[in-house]
Structure formats: C-alpha cells, structure tokens
Amino acid sequence: MNPFEGIVMGIVQGLTEFLPVSSSAHLVLVPWLFGFETPGLVFDVALHLGTLVAVLVYFWRDWLRLVQAGSRGVGTADGRLFWFLVVATIPGVVVGYFLEDIVETTLRAPLLIGVLLIMMGGVLYLADRYGGQVKRLLDIRFGDAMAIGLSQALAIIPGVSRSGITMATARLRGVERAAAARFSFLLSTPIIFGAGLMQMLKMDPGLLNLSFVLGVFTSAVVGFLAIWFLISWVSRHSFNIFVIYRVLLGLTVIVIALLRG
C-alpha cells in the first residue's frame, strides 16, 4: 500500500468509525471498488488506533472524571456509569477474541456486506423512529448498558457498524440521541484499544512504514472531526441521513458484486 492509499484509508476510517455506516465495511469495500492493495485486518485495526487517539482526545475530560469516580465505587452516577462501561465491554472482547479468524476469512464478502448495510440501516431507522427520548447519559442503567454491550459484539461483522448497532440499541432502550452517541463513543474506547493492542502484538514490524503512519495520523484527525460532527448533528436531527446513505451504498455494492460475479 503506497502513501496515497494509506492517507485515503485513514480518511475512510476516520469518517466511518464514528458515523453509523460501518468502518469495517468501508475498509473492505474501498480497496475492492478502487483496486487498492487489500490492507487486511491488521491494518484495519491499526487505523482504529488512530481513531482511538481521536476519541481519547475528544473525551479526555469525560474519561478523567469517570475513572476518578469509578475508583471510588458505584456511589455516584459517574461511578456507576464507569463500571457499566467496563461490564458492557466484556461481550465485545469475548466475541472478538474467539471469532476474529472466522470474520477475517469468511465474512468480508462484498455481497454480504451490501446486504448487511441495508438491513442494519433498517434497524437504525426503526430504532430511531420508535425509540424514546427519555434517558440522558447518567440515567443509563445496568440493563441498558448490558443490552448495548451485547449488541456491540455483533459489530465484528463488516456492514453492521459498531456505532450504528450500539446507538440503535440505546435508542430502543429509551436513550436520547445525543446521550446514545456519547455512550457509544465512550464504549468504543476500551474495545478499540483492546483490539488494536492484540493485533499490534502480532503485527510484522515491516508494516510500520510511511503509509502505515500516514494512515493512522489521518484517521486520528478525521476521526476527531467526525465525532464533533455527529454529536452536533444528532442534537438537532435524526439518523435518517445515515440510513439513506447505508441503503444507497448497500444497493450499489450488491449491483457491482453481482455484475462482477
């Protein structure tokens, strides 16, 4: 992968990690559509480390407050939220650890991704349309956190979207849009860190070239901007724009996949 392709993939990762459109799907589809060298799961996760930097920089005050409160137990709303995030991370860690090889070898077919983009777009639409607007971030309870955490485990499949499925689940549990987005982003921090660390330990040092560095840096900068955009957007609008994008992209991918055979 040359430096230009590394930058493009960094932009793709930064834009799509936090928007409910599936970053893993885009990291498979962009090389497939434009003839780039396929980066593989290791480079995918390395780009996720760039977006990890983005979410840590954006939410550092939140994490500082939550960690401090969590270290003192569950006597405060922030303390409870911290431990809810910890527990909600576990399903994604377990599923990712045991199913990584299956996903890498069998669940990255463009046709399947196209179908899942459309299906999960429908789920996001229905959840946002019929979900309540009752709970704020600190109103989230243990059952809400576990439901969101279990749904996050499905995001290992390209086309599902980690942010999409977690925000949809939160909306179904009555969490308002802005709070659903913030919880989703906070929940992404440990899962991205863990997945990235696991893959980095296996990674060939020869992959640490200019393209790799440019991709990670670009994904960090663009990811930060994507977080800012989504939080601003959902404060005033629904998720419909992302639903429309998912359906159109999914249909396009299905048509191209069928034409290519």
From Swiss-Prot:
GO biological process: cell wall organization; peptidoglycan biosynthetic process; regulation of cell shape; response to antibiotic
Subcellular location: Cell membrane
Topology class, membrane: Multi-pass membrane protein
Swiss-Prot/TrEMBL catalytic activity: di-trans,octa-cis-undecaprenyl diphosphate + H2O = di-trans,octa-cis-undecaprenyl phosphate + phosphate + H(+)
EC number: 3.6.1.27
Main location: membrane
InterPro entries tied to this protein: UppP
Keyword Cell inner membrane tagged: no
GO MF annotations, alphabetized: undecaprenyl-diphosphatase activity
Cystine connections: none
Domain of life: Bacteria
Pfam family membership, one: BacA
Extra facts: Bacitracin is thought to be involved in the inhibition of peptidoglycan synthesis by sequestering undecaprenyl diphosphate, thereby reducing the pool of lipid carrier available.
Similarity comment: Belongs to the UppP family.
Protein's UniProt name: Undecaprenyl-diphosphatase
Gene name in the database record: uppP
